[in-house]
Amino acid sequence: MRFAINHISAPKLALSKFFEMTKALGATEVEIRNDLPDVMGTMPASDVKAAAEAAGVTILSINALYPFNVWSGELAARAVAMADYAVACGAKALVMCPLNDGTEVPYDDLVAALKAMKPILTERGLTGLVEPLGFLISSMRKKETAIQAIKDAGGEGVYKLMHDTFHHYLAGETAFYPEWTGLVHISGVVDPAVDVADMLDAHRVLVDTGDRLENISQIKALLAAGYDGPFSFEPFAAEVHDLADPQAALAESIAYIENQL
């Protein structure tokens, strides 16, 4: 299997050091972010591209356009700016996340947003990675909803799914769509006290033997079904971000996953 690393795995590392760490881990694919750390807001795209080339890594995506399914206000301008940045830095895709504040978004609005985003992506040769969020307050929880909306928007070939093991588990999903999946995010929850309905990004750590999200079975199912893309670490927990040696921790998680497979 192919491992990739999202910058959120080691957000305190400068981008060049993060790229170097990824290569040292034996991986060659990375994801950069526009939230924490905000690479888009702090570095010229040309510098990002140069750093990636120097380290020998490929930028899979910029994470993330939010809330992509509410196509109003400044969203279109932000989408164009992110897409332009992606092209200039050498990224291949944009991660697209739905509104996640308890507000219901009509299905027709989801389809309309995908239609509006389609030319922005196609004109730049980018893929849109549509990521259902499994939280109860999410406006798009299920992958089947995303797939149907992509079809209704005529977005086949432009959009792929982001399969996130955390959100797959939270949404209670059982179906896998390897032919639709462009990237997989992996993270674990090990806190035995938190109820599934109360799991948040802050609970997401690296995958180890205490994982409650069935990462190993999800990974096995995806591989068995034919998915051959990267699996990208995306832990949000402060205890991961504060690690003195994130490379060692990631190496340990990689070894655990490989041993389980």
Where are these regions (language model features)?
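N-terminal pre-domain/capping segments
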Residues: M1-K92, T122, V158, D191, ...
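Hydrophobic faces of well-ordered beta-strands that scaffold small-molecule active sites
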Residues: F3-H7, V30-I32, I59-A64, L94-M96, ...
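A short, hydrophobic/aromatic-rich structural module that often spans a beta strand
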Residues: F3-L13, A79-A86, D109-M117, T145, ...
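Active-site beta-loop-alpha junctions enriched in small/polar residues
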Residues: N6-A10, R33-P37, A64-P67, L99-D101, ...
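Active-site acidic/histidine proton-transfer and metal-coordination neighborhood
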Residues: S16-E20, E53-A54, T58, F68-L161, ...
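Gly/Pro-rich active-site loop or hairpin
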Residues: V39, G73, E104-Y107, S139-K143, ...
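C-terminal appended segment following the main domain
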Residues: K118, R124, G226-L261
